[in-house]
Amino acid sequence: MKTYTSVIFWMRSIACLSIVIIHSITTTFSKMHDVPHSTSLRLFQLLLMFSTPMFVFISEFLLAKNYGSKIKKGFFKNKLIYLGIPYVIINLSISYFYFRPKNLHEYLFHVGDTMFHGGAVTYFIVIIFQFYLLHWLFSKYLIGLNPIKMIVISILITTMYWAMRTFISPPNNPILAAIWDREGWMIFIGWLSYFLLGFYIGTYYEAFMNKIKDYTWHIIIGAFLSIIFMFLNYILGISTWVESKRVDTPIYVTMVILLFFLFSSYICLLYTSDAADE
């Protein structure tokens, strides 16, 4: 049964605003060449890079919280209508209005690029569809496993995936080399930790919220250290891409998500106390 979770509303809203800010700064840098590329602005953008991964988390959290290990009848048909059709229409439009092809051949090239090669910002819809399938196939098995161990393992896998793309040169094989290109953005392995975090928090939401305040300082310190780690990677030139596909993003996004729920738990406690006083 669907239930309203206020923290998800705020997570979604802040993630949307963050994406707008990220692209506004990037567009300013790319279109106005006389604007200096400020390091402080780039670091500010990095702080907002939780946005796209958070949508993966939110999708799986809501699915796990509302339906558990099962999926309601007509689920995939519904998603194909409300996500699949817009995905096609938006990519067809981007291929024409943004790339401005000179002929049909160019247009079809851009359509193929945006649809199947991650050539447009809509690529995250493909990622979310992959996780819908994974939830359908594996959720009943995931419930029987240790959540903390699975989340830690998934963070390591996701981190190693982005580290591979960052620090290892692509192979000569053109099919494998595609993983190092934009196609690699669309593979679920690079987003696995957000999926499992969403699944387990959604599945055990009540128990999670009852316990989260016990780990207040762990979460705050962990978030602070993850920011320092991310900033150092950028400043020292270890990873200078300003995007969510970074080696330090999985742990950073995890801590940001936990901060949202931690803050929500204290807000709920405050409202409960006020109601009791009345």
Describe each PLM feature range.
Residues M1-Y4:
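Short, Lys/Arg-rich, polar N-terminal cytosolic tail immediately upstream
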Residues I21, L92, I155-F167, G222-I235:
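Aromatic-anchored segments of alpha-helical transmembrane domains
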Residues L41-T52, D113-I127, I168-Y194, L232-L258:
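Interfacial loop-to-helix transition and helix-capping segments at the boundaries
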Residues Q45-M54, N66-F97, L104, L108-A120, ...:
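Transmembrane alpha-helical segments and their boundary/interface "anchor" motifs
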Residues F97-P171, R182-L197:
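Hydrophobic alpha-helical segments with transmembrane-like composition
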Residues Y271-E278:
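Conserved small/polar residues in nucleotide/adenosyl-binding loops
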